[in-house]
Amino acid sequence: MKHLIISEYGIYLGLESGRLVVKNKDDKKYFPLNRLATLSIAKKGVSFSSDLVEQFSLRGIKLFFLDFRGVAHSMLVGANQHAVVQARINQYRYIDRNALTLSIKLIAAKIKNQRATLNYFNKHHKSINLLNAIEELKRVAQLIKNAKTLNDVLGYEGYAANIYFSSLAKDKFLSASFANREGRGSQEIANSMLNFGYAILSSYILNAITNAGLEPYLGFLHQKRPGKMSLVLDLMEEYRAWVVDRVVIKLREQYKNKQYIDTKLKSILISEIQATIAKKYIYNGKKLKLEHIIQRQVYRLSGEFAGEHNYKPYIFKW
């Protein structure tokens, strides 16, 4: 299934002969609706027809609206795409009792995937600095199993992130101006690329959560507060390093001399992340697109909430 992102000003989205038509001043592009899973609007000045919205609703195609950072601020789904009540009841009950256990598993996997990302680049760029970071991350992934509270988990996560990003900064795998990790609102180019990439990843995670009927605002690790999709942030953790960080590192030559992330860079980053998510990886002995792995992982998490499955985070092989 296709996930389409509109990042140009002045685009019109309509319906022609049962297909989505994307129009600008110079040309038209057509996309069959039966191959479309989501459409994200990442630019102001985009218009669309009510006929198209009706077809999206009938077919279960989700329409996301992203802010300038690429973060979804609105989602339009059909009235028939209701939540699965029992799935959410299971989620509420489980998280109330088992938040710590699940958080430990998830952040241990995040650290292992950070380590896999460093190993991936160390294959071709032999570095003592990277090797030291790889060994320290291995140690932290074991230590986190001793965490007694959610604050302990967050402490291990923060320490591992510092080791990971410091090693990338020392060997200049990101921009020359990258010194440490900065969140939303950062003006530093590599951090801006990372932040936009994470926002794109979050729309895939949100889509998978919605398909499973879970509550995106009820997470187990990240703080619960109005407007914050805590479960989306939680489930992103195991994919951040491999899906986004690795892509941003590979694109370094495209942005190393730029001061800010422009429309062209955003388009390149979107395309590369989409290519990564469309790539096939081994999952339970079969080769599946990462998009499908993410969905299966969310269904498996829903199964753990119901007491039917044991959730195992996905670990990437380098």
UniProtKB/Swiss-Prot annotation:
What induces or represses its expression, per the UniProt entry?
A: In culture expression is high during early log phase (1 hour), decreases and then rises again in late stationary phase (16 hours). During infection of mouse bone marrow-derived macrophages (BMDM) expression is maximal after 1 hour, when the bacteria is expected to be in the phagosome.
Q: What InterPro entries does this protein map onto?
A: Cas1, CRISPR-assoc_Cas1, CRISPR-assoc_Cas1_C, CRISPR-assoc_Cas1_N, CRISPR-assoc_Cas1_NMENI
**Which EC numbers does the record give?**
3.1.-.-
Task: List residues binding Mn(2+).
Answer: 157, 222, 237
Molecular function (GO) terms for this protein are:
DNA binding; DNA endonuclease activity; metal ion binding
The Gene Ontology biological process terms listed for this entry are:
defense response to virus; maintenance of CRISPR repeat elements
Q: What else is known?
A: Part of a type II CRISPR-Cas system.
Q: How does it assemble?
A: Homodimer, forms a heterotetramer with a Cas2 homodimer.
The identity of this protein, by name, is CRISPR-associated endonuclease Cas1 1
Species annotation: Francisella tularensis subsp. novicida (strain U112)
